[in-house]
């Protein structure tokens, strides 16, 4: 609030987004903003109360709901989309593919667009939770522009269900000011040092694929293993490490930035964002290997605002818009048209584009891991220990 008690448009929008993302209660939102004070800016801020702009595809409604990962978009692009279409982008953030799958299986998610990872798409298809895409509604989609390694998973049995968003790797971020002059280079270092000089300062994902997968790599096993004996080894390690953790969370940037955490499992773009703002934080791919992944835009079955969903995906696929996304979040993109617009320092950045020998050791997630009961039960035991 300002000194005279009147909330500004920027403050109102910030509180509105916190409420829509579930970060605060409706009571908090109403109390902080004050309906009387907010009235002056409601016409510019609330969907349905602002005049709709003309849009080439016609009237798409006043809202579109996007389910996505933390720190994964340029908010200014959403504002530009709203200016162009009149549809407000409501963002729901999730921390794992299991969380996303469970939400869609339960029904009534209210989502229009979601961002699944490559290995999950066949499950969505088999459970009839995802819509085939009508490419005639995606004028900015050009299949030939995408690297097949990061695009092929979107097509199942010859039908296109998802289009590429970004790709990246899973490593760890370490605040080198606290490494005592001895660099961490492996998953063995990650877990061993967590139980030593990084005790109480380490975070792992709230996500079975990566937390279990990286524990498996400690022993030299496959990142995707569902072998009971190998999972038992990973569980013993995780239970041993648990008392030394700062937190189990997929939203680790705040703790790393504040200095509460010094070491965390980390995705490419987060590593780039942290390193850009705090050069003492390094992003490391464990030399044993780990995960390479690709994310996609998709539309869930029964999306309530289907026209707006297509409009948002098409808008975000436009090369100039996509380039702004990359510059904001730091995740590589598989679209050659977008890459042609990016500066060399992005395309040559070793965090975003690691050396080939490091990439060769990485594995794409396997569909079996998403629904394997042993992995799900292992993570539950680890979290409750």
Roles of regions detected by a PLM:
Residues 122, 203-207, 211, 215, ...:
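Ligand-binding pocket segment of bilobal, Venus flytrap-like solute-binding proteins
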Residues 24-45:
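N-terminal export leaders
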Residues 119-130, 151, 155-185, 210-219, ...:
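Periplasmic solute-binding protein
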Residues 1-28, 51-53:
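N-terminal secretory signal peptides
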Residues 55-123:
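Early extracytoplasmic/lumenal segment of secretory-pathway proteins
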Residues 109-113, 131-135, 140-172, 200-202:
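A structural signal for short loop-to-beta-strand junctions that line the ligand-binding cleft
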Residues 295, 300-359:
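Mature extracytoplasmic/periplasmic domains
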Residues 131-142, 162, 279-291, 300-303:
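Short beta-strand->loop
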């Amino acid at each position: 609030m300002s000194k005279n008690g009147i909330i500004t448009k920027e403050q109102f929008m910030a509180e509105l987004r916190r409420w829509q993302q579930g970060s605060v209660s409706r009571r908090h939102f109403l109390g902080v903003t004050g309906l009387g004070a907010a009235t002056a800016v409601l016409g510019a801020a609330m969907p349905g109360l602002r005049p709709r702009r003309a849009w080439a595809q016609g009237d798409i409604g006043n809202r579109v709901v996007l389910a996505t990962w933390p720190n994964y978009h340029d908010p200014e692009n959403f504002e530009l989309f709203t200016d162009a279409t009149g549809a407000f982008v409501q963002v729901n953030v999730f921390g794992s593919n299991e969380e996303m799958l469970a939400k869609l299986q339960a029904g009534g998610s209210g989502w229009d667009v979601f961002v699944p990872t490559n290995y999950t798409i066949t499950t969505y298809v088999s459970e009839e939770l995802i819509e085939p895409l009508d490419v005639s509604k995606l004028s900015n989609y050009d299949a030939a522009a995408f690297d097949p390694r990061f695009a092929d998973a979107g097509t199942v049995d010859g039908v296109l269900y998802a289009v590429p968003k970004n790709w990246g790797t899973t490593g760890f971020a370490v605040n080198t000011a606290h490494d005592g002059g001895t660099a961490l280079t492996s998953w063995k270092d990650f877990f061993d040092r967590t139980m030593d000089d990084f005790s109480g300062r380490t975070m792992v994902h709230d996500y079975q694929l990566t937390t279990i997968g990286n524990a498996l790599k400690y022993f030299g096993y496959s990142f995707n293993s569902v072998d009971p004996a190998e999972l038992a080894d990973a569980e013993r390690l995780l239970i041993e490490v648990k008392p030394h953790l700062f937190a189990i969370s997929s939203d680790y940037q705040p703790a790393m930035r504040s200095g509460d955490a010094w070491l965390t499992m980390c995705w490419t773009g987060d590593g780039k964002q942290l390193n850009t703002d705090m050069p003492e934080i390094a992003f490391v791919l464990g030399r044993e290997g780990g995960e390479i992944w690709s994310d996609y835009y998709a539309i869930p079955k029964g999306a309530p605002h289907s026209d707006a969903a297509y409009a948002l995906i098409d808008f975000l696929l436009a090369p100039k818009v996509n380039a702004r996304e990359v510059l904001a979040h730091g995740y590589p993109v598989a679209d050659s048209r977008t890459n042609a617009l990016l500066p060399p320092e992005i395309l040559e950045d070793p965090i975003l584009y690691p050396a080939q020998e490091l990439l060769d050791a990485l594995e794409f997630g396997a569909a079996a891991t998403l629904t394997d009961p042993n992995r799900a039960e292992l993570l539950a035991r680890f979290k409750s220990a």
